[in-house]
Amino acid sequence: METYGEAALLRTAKTALEAQGFCAEDFCDAAIEGLARLDEQGEAQYVRSLHAYLSSGLNLRRAAETMGIHRNTLAYRMRRIEARFALNLGDMNTCFELLFSLWLRDGIGGEVQPESTEPFDSGAVSAALWRFTERTGGAEAPCGGRFKLAVAAVGVGNMGDEKRMELTLALCALPQKPVAAFDEETLFLALPPEEIDAFAEAAGPLCEAARAGLVISQPFAMERLNARLRLCRLALLAAGVQTMEMRDMGSTLFFMALERKISLAPYLCEDVIRVMDEDATRGSALSRALYAYLLNFMDLKKAAQQLGIHRNTLEYQVRKMNAVIGEPPDGSKRFRMMCTYKMLALPDTGVHDV
């Protein structure tokens, strides 16, 4: 992000995403929109509180001072956020994805949509799923309806016909009775949002045994179905044969979508490249240590535990990193450096049309 900066990336991203039928909300954790709705109802400043907490490096005292509230008040809000949206703010990847969602929402996000009360319409979903899987290069038919649904997508492209049918029948026979449609590459299974967790728990072992990738979407409005199904295909490319929640990979999917339209090279943080060059020249492993340090919001103890090394060893490595990049990263640079790691870790799919 050094050459053009964050503002340029956001402007370019908005154009590139719209050209593919995506919007910012497709890549954001749904909890952020839920928090924004609570804020509009006057409950509390949840979005601002979460942003302050994440931007402060998960430091409650510093974040509370920024907010001008008591530390205990902020701690209570964080506990409510965790409970209400099934989040674990002790998981560093979750925290980064939430921070990324806030950044994207602030940069190019749209208006907060009211919560839908329309019931799940299995007939409409089935028809739309089959239209999507049977299209032959033509424009996607629009999907009507504001009711919410969630989708599980299974990668079946490498399976023989018999094995594919066996897995399809097993998944469709689960108690949740999903609405299903498929083509040669992907099996899509749609359910009401309240049933997706139970379905994922039951489907995971079946897909693992079949060595088939499984990705689970977040709840979304029916009108976004076509875009979310294409996003599921992207997620399967990243997941391989793993089972993954798409809320845990929003930043990866965002950069995968961008890479299909633009080169990401001008937006890489040069400091990360310098550290990697240092590793290549001297045979060191500073880049791995830097990633753990950044992911853990520059908490030496947590990062050292993740790496399985002594805290003092990591502290020494951090001093060497700082000598390479010139100065310790602040919160803003930490975010840019983490985004660079995400860009560099994108799967090499060789595909340029979802």
Which sequence ranges carry the predicted segments?
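Cytosolic nucleotide-utilizing catalytic cores of signal-transduction proteins
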Residues: M1-V354
